[in-house]
Amino acid sequence: MAFSRRYWLVLALCLALQGLGQVRADLVVLHTNDVHCGVENQLGYAQLAQYKKDLMKNPDDTVQLVDAGDAIQGEPLGSLTRGQAVIDIMNVAGYDFAIPGNHEFDYGVARLLELAPQLAGGYYSCNLVDLRTGKTVFPPYKMVAYDGGKKAAFIGVTTPQTLISSTPRYFQDDKGQFIYGFSEDATGQKL
């Protein structure tokens, strides 16, 4: 009886492991967040870029590398270049989509607006609004087609608390009037 149980257990385990090799994802999303100028020490931007490249070898898969904010500030590399070096690294790594986190504003809105067009994958935010025009500062989302016509939307949402967790004067004009907002309200309905 013991042989029979062991046999079936080993067989089930082998079949389960065999199935793992056949798992296929049509849309692969690699995600970073709060890296503050550097992907974790165990990985690094170079290895992240290589991982994306390796995944892209499967022609059936669409691979997207996305960042959910706080990438360009936090270490001397970012501070000394006011974010430029990290944007350059993100381009080499192949980022496809980024959301401005509260620390993307640490060099001021004007600086972020200088850096944003340089990020090949683009910055996206559905709720960072120029209050003078009522329009979003960045595109709100990015559509990605995969698997012969399926679509996925990557939607950028910057935390409305950025207005107070960053430096409020960065979002004001010379007269102290807010010229940028985050569709903030107590209910979240403005998003």
Label every model-predicted segment.
Residues 6-7, 19, 23-25:
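Positively charged, low-complexity intrinsically disordered regions
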Residues 1-9:
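Bacterial N-terminal signal peptides that target proteins for export
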Residues 10-18:
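Bacterial N-terminal signal peptides
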Residues 22-191:
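Acidic, metal/ion-coordinating pockets
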